[in-house]
């Protein structure tokens, strides 16, 4: 029987793939609404996706997502004051890394784990880190394919089983693919 007050070490990592910025933003907002901070959200996307969706269109409203994407790309904090919640989250997280050879942006606790692996181990380290977080290898392969196709992978280590169920439901409702806990 699941106890909704279990610690995060016993609660699942919820992961999902989002094919567009709008669905990723809504999923991120569902996490934020439950009191999770930007440093608790793992985001993986290609550098091309970051440039396409979070590069600072002056017609957009400032948001957390765009700034976080900018920092993940190594270009600093706010980017012209114009992006979404995920981008600001990318910028606000203390640890985010750009992997130039792979064209990949990683932010959140996962970035810290990868940074600890050292630059030489990042390529294999990403798959290993995701598998190490309890994500089955076949799902990691689907996520990798989705990232290459312009998607955004989000992951959150839930604090409670109730939170995990809530995130899974909300992310699926917001067009998340391969959403699991």
How should these model regions be labeled?
Residues 62-142:
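Small-residue-rich hydrophobic membrane-insertion segments
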Residues 2-65, 114-181:
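Cytosol/matrix-facing juxtamembrane amphipathic
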């Amino acid at each position: 029987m699941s106890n909704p007050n279990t610690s995060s070490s016993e609660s699942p990592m919820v992961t999902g793939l989002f094919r567009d910025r709008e669905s990723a933003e809504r999923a991120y907002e569902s996490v934020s609404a439950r009191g999770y901070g930007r440093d608790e959200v793992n985001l993986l996307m290609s550098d091309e996706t970051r440039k396409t969706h979070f590069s600072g269109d002056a017609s957009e409203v400032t948001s957390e997502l765009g700034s976080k994407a900018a920092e993940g790309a190594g270009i600093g904090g706010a980017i012209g004051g114009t992006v979404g919640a995920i981008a600001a989250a990318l910028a606000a997280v203390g640890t985010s890394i750009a992997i130039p050879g792979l064209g990949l942006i990683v932010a959140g606790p996962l970035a810290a784990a990868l940074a600890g692996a050292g630059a030489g181990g990042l390529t294999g380290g990403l798959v290993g880190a995701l598998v190490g977080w309890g994500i089955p290898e076949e799902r990691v392969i689907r996520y990798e394919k989705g990232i290459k196709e312009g998607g955004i992978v989000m992951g959150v280590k839930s604090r409670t089983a109730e939170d995990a169920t809530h995130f899974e439901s909300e992310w699926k409702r917001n067009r998340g693919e391969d959403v699991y806990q």
